[in-house]
């Protein structure tokens, strides 16, 4: 196992215009302060205020948006980071681990990773993801990529259909089809930060949001040693070269994770579990009393000093005894949140320290709060109650189905852009209006300038005389559409769908 030295991981250099020379502790901290400014002032963060956490198109400001959720995750991440550093200081290990002059950057990387962790999520959350992937699967059929004979391939896009005698090209076709059918919010976050927003963050800061290490074009089983880390796609084919450079800069082995990402993940797990239940009470899906009984029933028998007793029962009893001065709802969730944090944060911090050799190497194949402990059971309790009583509620399911229909419908509306030939689309990009393609011209005008420029830049770097050129061009055209639609807020996607479907407002 390699020696633990965080100076080799907290890399303050950037992809472009990187600071040069040896830096003092204060200068390094200023570099990460610059990252904070770039992130907090980015449009991608602002858009989170109109993407909802559980309840799409919610008008009640007390119910969490992705932005308010991310701010809560940021605070919990800061708490865990400080707890880790405090414990390492007590153990007199800060200097041994190369952290004595990097405590500020350590905290900042964790905080900003937490704030950014949802920036790649499409409108309507997981149902938006599912809509994008299902729509592309119905056209590209990635499951036919190994089909024999090749004539069994059902892909409806001619340039991506497998052909006899073109094996090197067929392998690229397989990768592209698989990649496009595995849109994922975390992978889109990497694409946003590097390719679309060009935020030019430090290598360490980007490493903090590389939550999953599986390429989106991966086919087959994942290695058992990295099964958890490769649970979902973490980056696209379009960012393959950037991620290869990132791994080199952060000393990450293939499919390994950046150490501070485990802290961001734990902060998210702690935050959303309580928040989803609080939002459900705010939405009147159940009362606080009903929630307490759901939690009690799901946990089962327990001793007086059990974690359930110390966290949930304690919150319930305190909220009832103080109900005259403040509402039971506010009291209950205040105590539940405080009790949960006071138990889970120190536990997550100690798990990080206990497993630091594997975490530093990027190979710890678990979440910090997924083990056989009572702390893990408490998180599972919150999640299971939310799944059973919140996500399955008719109002929530109806909104999710509407969201799925909106995203599918928008992709269908913009499909003519994908149906154009390479030469026709190239002409449209150059001229921005083609008389013989009036519908396509108008659809193209609606695309964001930032996304169009990303497409143009990517295609301009391709050798136009290569047999791979038509494949890559179509890939980036699909990315253009996915970038545009996934970047919409819930409300904008809803309104855009209604406008283009000529539905009365």
From Swiss-Prot:
Enzyme class at the top of the EC tree: hydrolase
Gene3D superfamilies listed in its UniProt record: Hypothetical protein af1432, putative deoxyguanosinetriphosphate triphosphohydrolase like domain
Name the UniProt record assigns to this protein: Deoxyguanosinetriphosphate triphosphohydrolase
Reported function: dGTPase preferentially hydrolyzes dGTP over the other canonical NTPs.
E.C. code: 3.1.5.1
Residue ranges of domain HD in the record: 66-273
CDD domains: HDc
Gene Ontology biological process: dGTP catabolic process
Gene: dgt
Sorted UniProt keywords: Hydrolase, Magnesium
Pfam family name, one: HD
HAMAP family: dGTPase_type1
NCBIfam families with a match to the protein in the record: dGTP_triPase, PRK04926.1
Family stated for the protein in its record: Belongs to the dGTPase family. Type 1 subfamily.
């Amino acid at each position: 196992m390699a020696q633990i030295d965080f100076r080799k991981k907290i890399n303050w250099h950037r992809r472009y215009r990187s600071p040069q020379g040896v830096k003092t502790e204060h200068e390094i901290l200023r570099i990460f302060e610059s990252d904070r400014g770039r992130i907090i002032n980015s449009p991608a963060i602002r858009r989170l205020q109109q993407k909802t956490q559980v309840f799409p198109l919610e008008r009640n400001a007390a119910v969490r948006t992705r932005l308010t959720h991310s701010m809560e995750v940021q605070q919990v991440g800061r708490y865990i980071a400080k707890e880790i550093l405090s414990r390492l200081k007590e153990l007199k290990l800060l200097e041994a681990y190369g952290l004595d002059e990097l405590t500020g950057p350590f905290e900042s990387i964790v905080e900003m990773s937490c704030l950014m962790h949802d920036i790649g999520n499409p409108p309507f959350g997981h149902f938006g993801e599912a809509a994008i992937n299902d729509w592309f699967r119905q056209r590209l059929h990635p499951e036919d990529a190994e089909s024999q004979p090749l004539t069994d391939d059902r892909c409806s896009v001619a340039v991506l259909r497998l052909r006899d005698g073109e094996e090197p090209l067929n392998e690229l076709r397989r990768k592209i089809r698989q990649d496009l059918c595995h849109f994922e919010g975390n992978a889109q976050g990497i694409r946003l930060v590097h390719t679309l927003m060009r935020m030019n963050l430090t290598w360490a800061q980007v490493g903090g949001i590389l939550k999953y290490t599986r390429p989106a074009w991966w086919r087959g089983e994942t290695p058992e040693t990295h099964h958890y880390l490769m649970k979902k796609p973490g980056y696209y084919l379009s960012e393959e070269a950037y991620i290869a450079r990132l791994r080199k800069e952060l000393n990450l082995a293939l499919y390994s994770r950046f150490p501070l990402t485990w802290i961001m993940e734990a902060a998210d797990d702690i935050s959303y579990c309580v928040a989803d239940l609080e939002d459900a009470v705010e939405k009147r899906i159940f009362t606080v009393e009903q929630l307490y009984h759901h939690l009690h029933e799901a946990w089962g028998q327990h001793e007086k000093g059990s974690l359930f007793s110390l966290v949930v029962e304690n919150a319930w009893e305190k909220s009832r005894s103080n109900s005259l001065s403040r509402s039971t709802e506010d009291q209950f969730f205040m105590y539940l949140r405080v009790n949960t944090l006071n138990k889970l944060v120190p536990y997550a911090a100690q798990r990080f320290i206990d497993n630091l050799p594997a975490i530093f190497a990027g190979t710890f194949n678990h979440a910090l709060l997924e083990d056989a402990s009572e702390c893990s059971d408490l998180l599972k309790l919150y999640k299971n109650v939310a799944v059973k009583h919140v996500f399955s509620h008719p109002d929530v399911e109806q909104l999710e189905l509407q969201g799925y229909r909106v995203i599918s419908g928008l992709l269908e509306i913009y499909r003519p852009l994908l149906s154009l030939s390479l030469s026709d689309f190239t002409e449209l990009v150059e001229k921005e209006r083609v008389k013989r393609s009036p519908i396509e011209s108008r659809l193209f005008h609606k695309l964001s300038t930032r996304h169009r420029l990303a497409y143009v830049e990517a295609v301009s770097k391709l050798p136009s005389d290569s047999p791979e050129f038509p494949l890559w061009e179509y890939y980036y055209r699909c990315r253009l559409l996915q970038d545009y639609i996934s970047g919409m807020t819930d409300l904008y996607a809803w309104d855009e769908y209604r406008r283009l479907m000529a539905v009365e407002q």
